[in-house]
Every structure is written in C-alpha cells, then in structure tokens.
C-alpha cells in the first residue's frame, strides 16, 4: 500500500514539475539558469522515497563561473538525489531519445539542455566540439555523466572522453560531483530508506592536459570519484 501511495504521489509531483517547469522555461526560453532551478525542484522530492539527503556544496562554489561538472550516474533515483547539485547557469548533455519521454522530454528541451545523438558519431563529435565554444561565449557550465549510461550497481563504469576533450578545449576545470550508492537501497514499502550524501568535489585543473593524454585525465577523475564514493558509503555505513 505504501509503495502504491508513493508511486502515485511521485507521478503527480513529477507531472506538476514538468508542466510548471515547461511554462516557466517558455517564458525564459532556454535561459541557462532554467536547468538548475527545475533540477532543484526534482531534487526536493527525496522525502517521498523515505530518504534523507545531505547536500555538500562548497561555500566558494558560486565563484566558479564556467566548468564541466561530471557526476556518477546510478539509476532513476538520480533525479531526486544528485540533480539538486546542478549549479546556476549549468546545462546538461543528454541522449537524444530523452525528447520522447512524456512531459519530461519537452521540459528537457525548453530548459536549454543539449541533446547528443549517440547513434551518429559525426553529429556526436560535432556536438562535443560546440560545447567548448558555448561555455565561453555564453558563460555557462556543462553537466555530464561520463559513464554514458546508468551503472545500476555495477560500480563506477569506465568514462567516455567527450567531457574531458571539451574541458581541455574550453580551458575550464573539471568538477566531480559524487553521490553515495543508492543501488538496492530504496524499498518503496519501507518508511525509512536511510541517508544519501551528494558532494561537489574540488575543481581539477586541466591546463596540463592535451588531446594526446585526455585518457589520463579521464582515468585520474575516475579514480578520484571512485575513491570518494567508497568513502561516502563507508561514512553512511558507520552512521555518521
């Protein structure tokens, strides 16, 4: 019964957010600030899942005007956990098929996010090449999930290099954002599903990297994030 009630409430809330967010974003058509505002609306739904989410955002975060944020992509619960961490004037890059999701697809487009056609390597490469130009010309940041797909409990998957190429080309830092593990953590028939921690890590300077050693940068970021996720999981397990 609790599961059905939660599903009903979440569906109603998500539809309302999509409708209101679409109207709001049409008024401010593709304004880069739209994404962060709507993402935080979704990010406030976590109590409906019996979760307590701690958001760790550095005090000086607002001083960083342009960056590429990379997050770990676990499952659909990312919408109510790590989505809250999207910063002002940050747009995300998502697969083209998102446009076909009822209500959400039009919202994703009108807020100003960027679609990536993974089926067409040429178009995908061109999209990534344009990111560097947009970051500097429009004074915005980009949010990406470098795993390219939800890992669904398989640990942090190998990173694709698109985000790192874009950061090097634009000359902006990479900022990892991590969320503690949610795989098999949430039981919709259970009132209390525990705690989740989301954290923005320190910026990573990319000035010492080129396209020739971009995979070294990706591997370095992967190792940092993997280690930090394990530390957050351990912290939660200890009850802190």
Curated annotation (Swiss-Prot):
Record pathway: Phospholipid metabolism; CDP-diacylglycerol biosynthesis; CDP-diacylglycerol from sn-glycerol 3-phosphate: step 2/3
One cellular component (GO) term of this entry: plasma membrane
SMART domains assigned to the protein according to its UniProt record, in alphabetical order: PlsC
The protein's Enzyme Commission number: 2.3.1.51
Coiled-coil residues: none
Annotated protein name in UniProt: 1-acyl-sn-glycerol-3-phosphate acyltransferase
Gene: plsC
Assigned keywords, A-Z: Acyltransferase, Cell inner membrane, Cell membrane, Lipid biosynthesis, Lipid metabolism, Membrane, Phospholipid biosynthesis, Phospholipid metabolism, Transferase
Signal peptide: none
A GO biological process held by the record: CDP-diacylglycerol biosynthetic process
Function of the molecule: Converts lysophosphatidic acid (LPA) into phosphatidic acid by incorporating acyl moiety at the 2 position.
Motif HXXXXD motif per record, residues: 73-78
Disulphide-bonded residues: none
